[in-house]
A protein has these predicted regions:
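Conserved active-site segments centered on acidic
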Residues: 223-269
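Active-site-adjacent structural elements in enzyme catalytic cores
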Residues: 1-227
């Protein structure tokens, strides 16, 4: 007999609350759950359930490379990465919850001992890095908060096909191959999250998405604003001196400070 996917409608506030609870329970039970984020629909599985992970790998035709972990709250990053790079902290503060996946160095072991003892490093990490995302959709985050173990969630489509923007798209590709689908309507952006890898003081965009590379650079930029209330001319003078000193410290021309992630402004004339 052909299996079918159970569909939960989640359009009203009460339906969304109930769907989040049922989704969390299904994940904890080892089921594959389709759900919306602000970008595209994803398929979630709990990482400490080998059977669920095997089904997800088969579904996505991805036998080895790990899937990104989806977080209920931005501060949950510290469950996985003990030493979050400053650049990543800046992106988290400005762009999470939101359409940004970060690939961060782990440092040899997961920060949360319970996860480490369960052997989840090998499940979640690749070349000592981990992919993390905090979606900007209340239903998704409420569901994730109801699960005690890491939830991974790749896009709800077959490998090589377009990401699903609606529950209808998910069913077209995955009906009968996932256990539960929470239908909360079309996604806000209809495109994938931007993937950025951060290591030390360097970063690079690994996959284009909602945020462009220019927007990521702007999010990372640090701004120095000089305001001299007694004499506005001094603001411009102070800004000029700061540009010169900063350029010397960074060993770059003052005209390249923006490219290095700095913006020096004056509130005076």
């Amino acid at each position: 007999m052909h299996a079918t996917t159970t569909i939960l409608k989640a359009m009203s506030a009460s339906e969304r609350t109930q769907a989040a609870r049922q989704g969390a329970a299904a994940l904890a039970d080892g089921q594959l759950v389709g759900f919306a984020t602000e970008t595209v629909y994803g398929v979630g599985a709990v990482a400490n359930n080998p059977s669920a992970m095997e089904r997800l790998r088969e579904l996505k035709d991805r036998p080895k490379r790990p899937f990104s972990v989806h977080l209920a709250e931005p501060e949950d990053v510290h469950l996985y990465v003990a030493d979050v790079p400053p650049l990543a902290r800046r992106l988290i503060a400005k762009a999470w919850p939101g359409p940004l996946t970060l690939i961060l160095p782990v440092g040899g072991q997961l920060a949360e001992r319970r996860f480490a003892r369960a052997g989840l490093y090998d499940v979640l990490c690749w070349q000592d890095t981990i992919g993390l995302r905090c979606p900007d959709l209340e239903l998704a985050r409420e569901m994730l908060s109801g699960v005690d173990w890491p939830v991974v969630a790749p896009s709800a489509n077959l490998a090589g096909t377009k990401s699903a923007r609606s529950a209808k798209d998910v069913l077209k590709a995955l009906d009968g191959r996932i256990d539960l689908l929470i239908d909360s309507g079309p996604t806000r952006y209809g495109q994938d999250s931007t993937v950025v890898q951060v290591e030390g003081d360097t970063w690079r965009v690994m996959r284009d998405g909602v945020y462009s590379q220019r927007q990521i650079a702007r999010l990372l930029r640090r701004t120095l604003l000089f305001v001299c209330t007694g004499n506005t001319c001094r603001s411009a003078l102070a800004a000029g001196l700061a540009r010169k000193m900063l350029a010397e410290r960074l060993a770059c021309p003052s005209g390249k400070l923006a490219a290095a992630g700095w913006e020096v402004l004056s509130a005076g004339g």
